[in-house]
């Protein structure tokens, strides 16, 4: 089980990025949150190792057809608490 913090930069706000991120999370049984912050999108996610890898790849390759990810920062976090769903906040 992994817990990650992912910041995604580029054209990721106002293009349905959070909605598509939620759909990707549901496809891979990922729990956590996605939210707009300043000029990027912030994601906290938990899931099995292989599912997290596929989730990250899906998000970075463009969760939304109108998005354009230019860079991202990934941080591994300790698994202090188990989340129960994936929400856009």
Curated annotation (Swiss-Prot):
The keyword Hydrolase applies. The active site is at 18, 36. It catalyses: an acyl phosphate + H2O = a carboxylate + phosphate + H(+). The keyword Secreted does not apply. Its EC number is 3.6.1.7. One of its GO terms (molecular function) is acylphosphatase activity. InterPro entries: Acylphosphatase-like_dom, Acylphosphatase-like_dom_sf, Acylphosphatase_CS, Carbamoyltrans_HypF-like. Keywords: Hydrolase. Belongs to the acylphosphatase family. This is Acylphosphatase. It comes from Staphylococcus aureus (strain NCTC 8325 / PS 47). The gene is acyP.
């Amino acid at each position: 089980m992994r817990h990650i913090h992912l910041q995604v930069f580029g054209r990721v706000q106002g293009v349905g990025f959070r909605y598509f991120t939620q759909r990707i999370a549901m496809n891979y049984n990922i729990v956590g949150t996605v939210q707009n912050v300043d000029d990027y999108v912030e994601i906290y996610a938990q899931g099995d190792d292989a599912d997290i890898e596929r989730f990250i790849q899906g998000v970075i390759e463009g969760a939304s057809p109108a998005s354009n990810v230019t860079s991202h920062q990934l941080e591994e976090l300790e698994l202090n608490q188990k989340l129960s769903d994936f929400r856009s906040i």
